[in-house]
Swiss-Prot record:
Residues 836-900, 925-1011, 1028-1081, 1090-1125, 1149-1165 have a biased composition (Basic and acidic residues). InterPro entries: EIF3A (IPR027512), eIF3a_PCI_TPR-like (IPR054711), PCI_dom (IPR000717). The keyword Cytoplasm applies. GO terms for molecular function: mRNA binding; translation initiation factor activity. This is Eukaryotic translation initiation factor 3 subunit A. It is found in: Cytoplasm. Component of the eukaryotic translation initiation factor 3 (eIF-3) complex. The eIF-3 complex interacts with pix. Residues 319-502 form the PCI domain. Belongs to the eIF-3 subunit A family. It comes from Drosophila persimilis. RNA-binding component of the eukaryotic translation initiation factor 3 (eIF-3) complex, which is involved in protein synthesis of a specialized repertoire of mRNAs and, together with other initiation factors, stimulates binding of mRNA and methionyl-tRNAi to the 40S ribosome. The eIF-3 complex specifically targets and initiates translation of a subset of mRNAs involved in cell proliferation. Disulfide bonds: none annotated.
Length: 1173
């Protein structure tokens, strides 16, 4: 018996019952069984499954069973992702909301537990336990409480987010929900400071994006080529970037920036300026935290350009603040190294150039920026003119003016302004240290151009904002990175610049303000300077020489141009043609590639659609099959459940069923359950009777003894209680009387005291009434006037309102009347359409019935034809068997007989030739021709099957069911064809058997040597004489003559087939030449019968040959069609035949034309007659 499974609504009720009795695990198992059962997946709608799913997820959250919730969510997604996406979204949001609420409650509970612990003992705050715990684990009470109470719920919530993201990552209908859950997960990491989970979440989202990009060609799923998908992914990555910056996870922020840049590059739509501004701002922040001042300044410059170009309502203060930020960030870039290729020997993974190129791509720059290029761009954008005077001076002092003695003092004033400025200026404070380092480097470079040596003390006075150690470090860095010739003499506390005049490693290119070159640079470029000066002097001494040289050179150039201008012109034209051809070739290739890509995408789309359609059809069929099975199973379960419920209505039935589990109940039938119920009832009755008897005795003795002992005790207790009650009543009554007397005395005294105030009260009331009477009258008049005006106003409003109501009522009645008429017209049209549809349906049913009757009639005809075919086939088989049996009997009778060949034959007369040609055919030939008849009958059946197939094709236009009749008749023709083949194989087997028998039993003569053969005496012409009648090949001649005589005496037989007579060895007068007759025996001394013969099957024409059909169908034609043509190969007249005609050529009664048989008149019907067979 199949396992019993509950319906979803019953499972929900049972789960609620388990929850009420405190068994949530059993309730969860009950609901889980429903989702594990494949029967209910497609049998119910979301209105039935959704409440059950909410209860299922509620239990999973309560029990912290995230893996069970995942199983249910995936099953629910498979059920309703293509049917009702809103239901799936509601379920997932409800699940996450429940998990978040439980996590927040756990956090509040953890905080409350810590507060209770902290306020437990105010006198002893630091308990020994808390001291020991803090020393062992280094955690406070809050951390321990969170680990115990909050951390399990945090883990459950994190798993829930991951499950939902995995659930929705490839669902194109839930993209918005997927990205909402991703943002909720970011908020979760921010709220609970989960950095490791945040990294895993970023990796998970990045992996999902890679999967989407890989499967972008598929039509089923999320496609990154859609604009909506790209925008959602971009917004999610921007939110991820904000969250990473808030959590100070700069590596994840950089990866998010790479993802954002990739999405913006992938999108065909230009990102909005607000998004680009946010992108550049976050990118500048990441570069700043990474310590890359160069790209930080480049990002701020891009942000400044974007804001200045696209923001129309930008105020002057905002523009000034942004310009100051960009200028200070650019000036704070450290001075570049003179030989950056040295870093290649230190870096292990990638060269700095590759890293810089990769970062430049994020900023949309063609090549990595440099400090010089950024300052040049800042000047081009007129940034120094937009900032305040102080920052403009800062730019001039660092990049334009050469004043090393006052440089640090000037920069210090700017630093003080930044440090003491307003709040918005404090945003520039991170650039102070970088600005100081750049200033010190500028100071060292400018000092090296002015002084050859300087003391440390003096240099420290000039560098006001650094100590000796920082200054020495900067000097070493300048030597290492900037190729400055600096030597520090600690003994004399002095510094020497450019002392080695023989060393100059590179060409000096001044960066910033410069006064003069270094001595080593001057020595290195002395020859260059000398050459320049000498060239200038020569041009002054010989002013015309250069002019003559230029004229001569010009003449040569013109001459050379005239020589090659044609060739160059042709080359240019040819190059232009090559370029055009190349463009056309590239364009053709691009067009072909686009067409191929479009064709491929179209083909993939078509295949995907076909696959999806096929999948949907298979799913529909599977759902229908499962629904049908579910209905059958539900009926069985319902009947069993009704029986169980009928038994469980009684108390003893419930008790009996409680002892059995569900599996045990399923294994029982109704009779077994009724038997157990009766047994349980009998057993309970016996137990109850025995208990009642035992308790009767016990209660009787016990109650009697107890009451006898209670009587004196009850009497004593009642007496004491009466005395105590009387005393209590008397004391209570005395107290009540005393309280009543005291209350009356107090009330009387109060009344007497208040009587003196009555005159004063009356006087006051009279005076107050007189004072306010006039005011009351005036207000009353005003009120009456206002009341009258309001009454008139309301009356007028009521008149207007009633008029409007009547108008609206009239319009509503008109509209209702119009709608009623339209409804009547619509109903009449619908009735007419239904009547027309019903008429069409009846007409179709009549046509179907007519077609069905035709099909039944045709089927009856086909069955009759098959029956006739079978009867004819059996008749032919019987005839072959009878003839074979008769030939076996005749073999023993005609073989011993024989005779000499007629002398006329020996004389070579024509009559003799005709006589021996018409001798009886051998048995093997008759059997073989019988097989040929069967085969020809099979071929006729095959042609009949073809005709029936064509008839079936014609009937196919009338309906598909008629086609099966043609197929059956086609199979009938094939069966008859196989029957003919079997008959042919039978004839072949008989012939082989007779050929393999001995010489005495065979009509053929074995080939023997001439000496053993006993050939006849040759005549004078040298040809062998015909053998005597005693030879083996003439045995049976008398039998043939007797048979021929019998044939003549039979008279005409109209129902006999001529071919059957010929096949059985008979001959006819005036038979004419036969197509299969052999030529006359040649005078070669041999026996023509001994020569090997070809099989008749080898001589036959194909079944479709017209001549073959004419020969085989000769019985249906007249004598004219069977008469031999004149001048045939074996005519009975003419000298060549050796004589005139004989008695065999005379017409006999058997040669009379057979009467024509009636042919079927109905050409549309198919039937087979015995003649056709």
């Amino acid at each position: 018996m199949a396992r019993y499974t509950q319906r979803p609504e019953n499972a929900l009720k049972r789960a609620n019952e388990f929850i009420e009795v405190g068994k949530p695990l059993r309730a969860l198992d009950t609901l889980q069984e429903v989702f594990r059962n494949k029967r209910w997946n497609y049998a119910y709608s979301e209105t039935v499954i959704e409440p059950l799913m909410f209860k299922y997820l509620y239990l999973c959250v309560e029990l912290k069973k995230s893996h069970i919730a995942k199983e249910g969510l995936f099953q629910y997604r498979n059920m309703f992702q293509l049917v009702n996406v809103n239901s799936l979204e509601n379920v997932i949001r409800g699940y996450l909301k429940m998990a978040e609420e439980h996590t927040e409650a756990a956090q509040a509970q953890s905080s409350a537990a810590v507060a209770v612990l902290e306020l437990d003992d105010l006198d002893n705050i630091a308990t020994p336990e808390s001291i020991l715990m803090s020393a062992v684990c280094g955690e406070d009470a809050q951390d321990r409480s969170d680990r115990t109470i909050l951390l399990p719920w945090v883990k459950f919530l994190w798993e829930s987010y991951c499950q939902c993201l995995e659930l929705l990552r490839v669902n194109t209908h839930c993209e918005a929900l997927y990205h909402d859950i991703a943002r909720m997960a970011f908020q979760f990491c921010l709220k609970y400071n989960r950095k490791s989970e945040f990294r895993r979440l970023c990796d998970k989202l990045r992996k999902h994006l890679e999967d989407i990009c890989k499967s972008s060609n598929q039509t089923t799923g999320v496609s990154i080529n859609k604009v909506e998908t790209q925008q959602l992914c971009l917004d999610t990555r921007l939110y991820l970037l904000d969250s990473a910056i808030q959590m100070e996870l700069w590596q994840e922020a950089y990866k998010a920036i790479e993802d954002i840049h990739g999405l913006m590059a992938l999108s065909k739509k230009t990102p909005v300026p607000k998004t680009m501004a946010n992108y550049y701002q976050k990118l500048a922040m990441v570069f700043s935290k990474a310590g890359n001042q160069l790209f930080h300044a480049a990002a701020l410059l891009k942000l400044f350009q974007l804001t200045r170009e696209l923001k129309k309502n930008l105020t002057k203060d905002d523009l000034q603040r942004m310009a100051a930020h960009v200028l200070l960030a650019t000036l704070s870039i450290p001075l570049p190294s003179a030989h950056p290729e040295f870093d290649r020997f230190i870096e292990a993974d990638k060269s700095p150039l590759e890293k810089a190129q990769k970062l430049a791509v994020l900023l949309g720059l063609p090549q990595p920026p440099t400090r010089v290029s950024l300052i040049r761009e800042v000047v081009r954008l007129n940034v120094p003119q937009l900032v305040s005077e102080d920052f403009r001076n800062l730019y001039n002092w660092l990049e334009v003016d050469f004043n090393p003695l006052n440089l640090c003092k000037r920069i210090q004033s700017i630093v003080d302004i930044i440090e003491t400025g307003p709040t918005e200026t404090n945003l520039l404070s991170p650039y102070i240290q970088s600005l100081k380092d750049v200033t010190i480097m500028r100071l060292i470079r400018q000092i090296s151009q002015v002084y050859e040596s300087i003391e440390f003390k003096r240099l420290l006075e000039l560098a006001t904002f650094c100590n000796i150690f920082e200054l020495e470090k900067l000097l070493v860095e300048s030597v290492r990175h900037n190729d400055m010739q600096i030597r520090i003499d600690h003994q004399k506390n002095s510094i020497y610049f450019g002392t080695d005049l023989t060393e100059s490693q590179r060409e000096y290119r001044p960066d910033g303000p410069a006064l003069q070159s270094m001595p080593s640079e001057q020595i290195r470029s002395q020859l260059v300077n000398m050459s320049t000066v000498l060239t200038r002097a020569v041009s002054i001494v010989y002013p015309n020489r250069e002019r003559d040289q230029r004229a001569k050179l010009r003449t040569q150039m013109v001459h050379h141009y005239h020589e090659i201008k044609d060739r160059e012109h042709q080359r240019i034209l040819q190059r232009q043609k090559i370029i055009e051809d190349r463009k056309e070739y590239i364009e053709k290739q691009n067009n072909a590639r686009e067409e191929e890509e479009a064709r491929r995408q179209e083909e993939e789309s078509r295949k995907a659609k076909l696959a999806e359609q096929k999948r949907l059809e298979l799913e529909q069929e599977e759902r229908e099959r499962k629904r049908h099975q579910n209905e059958i199973q539900a009926i069985k379960e319902k009947s069993l459940k009704e029986k169980v419920q009928q038994i469980s209505q009684t108390a003893h039935g419930k008790k009996m069923l409680s002892k059995l589990d569900e599996e045990g109940i399923k294994k029982l039938d109704a009779e077994q359950i009724a038997k157990r119920e009766s047994e349980e009832l009998q057993r309970e009755r016996k137990e109850l009777q025995s208990k009642l008897k035992s308790q009767e005795k016990k209660i009787d003795y016990y109650e009697r003894a107890k009451r006898l002992e209670e009587i004196p005790l009850f009497e004593k207790y009642l007496a004491e209680k009466q005395v105590k009650d009387k005393e209590f009543w008397e004391a209570t009554e005395k107290t009540r009387i005393e309280n009543a007397i005291a209350e009356r005395k107090d009330a009387v005294s109060q009344q007497e005291r208040l009587k003196r105030m009555y005159p004063d009260r009356d006087e006051f009331l009279e005076a107050l009434k007189k004072e306010r009477a006039s005011l009351y009258v005036e207000k009353l008049k005003k009120f009456e006037i206002a009341l009258e005006a309001e009454r008139k106003k309301r009356l007028a409003d009521r008149v207007i309102r009633r008029r409007e109501e009547r108008r609206q009522a009239f319009l509503r009645e008109k509209e209702e009347e119009r709608l009623r008429k339209e409804e009547e017209i619509r109903l009449a049209q619908a009735a007419e359409e239904r009547a027309a549809a019903e008429a069409r349906r009846l007409e179709r049913e009549a046509e179907d019935e007519k077609r069905r009757a035709q099909y039944e009639k045709q089927r009856a005809k086909e069955e009759e034809a098959e029956r006739k075919i079978k009867e004819d086939r059996d008749r032919l088989a019987r005839e072959v068997a009878v003839e074979r049996e008769r030939s076996d009997k005749e073999r023993d009778t005609w073989r011993p007989r024989g005779g000499d060949r007629p002398s006329a034959a020996a004389a070579g007369g024509g009559g003799g030739a005709g006589e021996w040609r018409r001798a009886a055919a051998p048995i093997g030939d008759r059997n073989e021709r019988a097989g040929d008849r069967i085969e020809r009958g099979g071929e006729r059946m095959e042609r009949g099957g073809d005709r029936m197939e064509r008839g079936g094709d014609r009937m196919e236009r009338g309906g598909e069911r008629t086609e099966r009749g043609g197929d059956r008749m086609d199979r009938g023709g094939e069966r008859m064809d196989r029957g003919g083949e079997r008959g042919e194989r039978g004839a072949d087997r008989d012939r082989e058997r007779r050929d393999n028998e001995g010489a005495d039993s065979s009509w053929r003569v074995r080939r023997e040597p001439d000496s053993q053969r006993g050939a006849g005496v040759k005549d004078a012409s040298g040809s062998a004489a015909p053998p005597s009648r005693d030879d083996k090949w003439r045995r049976g001649g008398d039998r043939d003559r007797d048979r021929d005589r019998d044939f003549r005496n039979d008279g005409p037989r109209r129902d006999r087939d001529d071919r059957d007579d010929r096949d059985r060895g008979g001959f006819r007068r005036n038979d004419g030449p036969r197509r299969n007759d052999d030529a006359a025996p040649r005078e070669t001394g041999g026996n023509w019968r001994d020569a090997p013969r070809q099989s008749d099957r080898d001589n036959r024409r194909p079944a479709g040959d017209r001549r073959d059909r004419e020969v085989r169908g000769g019985d249906l034609r007249g004598p004219e069609s069977r008469a031999p043509k004149e001048g045939g190969p074996s005519g009975g007249t003419g000298t060549a035949a050796g004589g005139g005609g004989n008695w065999r050529t005379a017409p006999g009664p058997r040669d009379e034309p057979a009467p024509k048989r009636d042919q079927p008149q109905d050409k549309g019907k198919f039937s087979l007659t015995p003649v056709q067979l």
